[in-house]
Amino acid sequence: MPTLRILALLAVTALSASAAEVKYQLAPNFLGTPPGKATIGNGHGEIAVDSAGLIYVSVQEKDAGIQVYGQDGKYLKTLALPMSLHGFVIRKSTDGEFLYGAVLNEQRFIKAKLDGTVVMEIKPDAFPADKGTAKDKAGKSVNALKLTSCDVAPNGDIYIVDGYGKSWVFVFGADGQFKSVFGGPTQVVDGKGFANTHKVFVDTRFSPARLLCLDRGNNRMFHVDLDGSNARMIANKGLRNPSSASFHGDLMCVAEIAGRISVWDKEGKMVASLGVNDTKGQTSTPKVAPADWREGVVTSPHGITFDKDGNILETEWNIFGRVLRWNRK
């Protein structure tokens, strides 16, 4: 009996320690603005942190699609990248550290150095013709791709999702050559095809790595193997339309566009909820004005990232542009 009591106490202690590890505190007014601007500008994209701790935020500005900030939140510079980097990640490999991005309005993929130099491109005609074309009202073939997100697997394969189109997930080699496609409306997971699979991320918390699919049209998120098989549901109830995610240690943070940031453990249990907004008309919209923003309360979370210390940064779908930060306690 004493042994059982000791084990029980250890279990409670472990649970308490685990809970303490996922507490966060808002860092008010963390991010600055570019010179002469009251806000960062029209946001409908993503946020990421490089290995040096610099913060990259995409905005809807022509030839100035990425703003770079220091670890202290102060504006540093703008990169001359496309204005519609709806989804991007920063990944480090043996050949360096690069930004990988899905250019929504141009339906192409880019790989760029962190100074903004584009070193590789996957153009629209590299995608399978039967997945990337449609007929307009006049019967003319048009490009139907609507690329929203991308990520890179440990072996260098590139995953690109057609999240505003048919939700196909395209796989390209590190050299930019097409390899395969899965997902879309014809691949059924728990009775439903992929729908508005807004963003996908390679989840290296698992071995082998898996692909996280934020299937926003069905208000759910699930894993598949990197070949698209073996779907595993993470959550399909109680979500607020998951739009982006990031990983740190065993944790995953999720930006939910209907007004919430959630944090999940590796077993798929939600362990924290941040910035919840239940005010009608203030979520799933880009039009909430700065006068209506409330400290620590989100509007329409669209992009999210952990930094190297496990702090959370979130960027919103907002025509004025907004970034919030929560520090890990």
What do the PLM-derived regions correspond to, one by one?
Residues 27-38, 119-141, 177-195, 272-296:
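Surface-exposed loop and turn segments in beta-propeller and other repeat-based domains
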Residues 37-51, 82-100, 127-157, 187-210, ...:
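Beta-rich, blade/repeat-based domains predominating
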Residues 208-214, 237-279, 286:
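Loop/turn-rich, solvent-exposed surfaces of beta-rich toroidal or solenoidal domains
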Residues 28-64, 148, 320-321:
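Beta-strand-rich domains and repeat architectures in extracellular enzymes and scaffolds
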Residues 60-61, 104-106, 163-164, 205, ...:
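Short loop/turn segments immediately following the C-termini of beta-strands
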